[in-house]
């Protein structure tokens, strides 16, 4: 692991070597906006804004991307809910349960699945207000997601409205799937088969499929 310093909390960002090419720009962009971000109480706390930068990228095949953290109790790991109370991760787990037949589980975490990096486009929000920090993170968000898409084969974005123009923001030739948000109305996410489709496409590309059942916690 490497680390860099920034002028505001969290003051130190620890990161895996695979993120090295974007770190100088990240530090510059963060120092420009941090004082505005940190006027608010945030979800997650600043010490957890950049926790996913500790993840390697070269061993990832799929990025599962949400728009921003939970408005309360964000951990810095997208979709993670240690007490398994958040609707989004519960719906994701239900979807994987239907796909895999696994039923006796107590939680689910995308961050423990080989080949997968969960990501949030915006890395924080004001406590209780989803997408409230979008304007501050925008430059950083584009920088980091573009870097991720240089490594993964598939970008799976959860939220048809939030990610309607995501392809226009990407320069890498990554296959992008935009599906329903897990909390979408009328239980639309239940009909979404993107996890299954990703594995079909990986196999067509002669890549190993994702073992989505690996995310279950027992």
Swiss-Prot record:
GO terms for biological process: DNA repair. InterPro entries: Ura-DNA_Glyclase_AS, Uracil-DNA_glycosylase-like_sf. It is an enzyme of class 3 (hydrolase). The active site is at 68 (proton acceptor). It catalyses: Hydrolyzes single-stranded DNA or mismatched double-stranded DNA and polynucleotides, releasing free uracil. Keywords: DNA damage, DNA repair, DNA-binding, Hydrolase. Belongs to the uracil-DNA glycosylase (UDG) superfamily. UNG family. Homodimer. Interacts with protein OPG148. Component of the Uracil-DNA glycosylase(UDG)-OPG148-polymerase complex; OPG148 and UDG form a heterodimeric processivity factor that associates with OPG71 to form the processive polymerase holoenzyme. Plays an essential role in viral replication as a component of the DNA polymerase processivity factor. Excises uracil residues from the DNA which can arise as a result of misincorporation of dUMP residues by DNA polymerase or due to deamination of cytosine. This is Uracil-DNA glycosylase. It comes from Variola virus (isolate Human/India/Ind3/1967) (VARV). The gene is OPG116.
């Amino acid at each position: 692991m490497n680390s860099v310093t920034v002028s505001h909390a969290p003051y130190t960002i620890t990161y895996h070597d695979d993120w090295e090419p974007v770190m100088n720009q990240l530090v510059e962009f963060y120092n420009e906006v941090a004082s505005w971000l940190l006027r608010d109480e945030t979800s997650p706390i600043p010490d957890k804004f950049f926790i996913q930068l500790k993840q390697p990228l070269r061993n990832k095949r799929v990025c599962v991307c949400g728009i921003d953290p939970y408005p309360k109790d964000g951990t810095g790991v997208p979709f993670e809910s240690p007490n398994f109370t958040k609707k989004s991760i519960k719906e994701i787990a239900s979807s994987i349960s239907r796909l895999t037949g696994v039923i006796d589980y107590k939680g689910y975490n995308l961050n423990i699945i080989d080949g997968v990096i969960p990501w949030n486009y915006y890395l924080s929000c004001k406590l209780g207000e989803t997408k409230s920090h979008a304007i501050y993170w925008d430059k950083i968000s584009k920088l980091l997601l573009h870097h991720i898409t240089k490594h993964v084969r598939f970008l799976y974005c959860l939220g048809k409205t939030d990610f309607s123009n995501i392809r226009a923001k990407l320069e890498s030739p990554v296959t992008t799937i935009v599906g329903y948000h897990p909390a979408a109305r009328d239980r639309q996410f239940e009909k979404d088969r993107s996890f299954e489709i990703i594995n079909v496409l990986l196999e067509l590309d002669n890549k190993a499929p994702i073992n989505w059942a690996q995310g279950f916690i027992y």
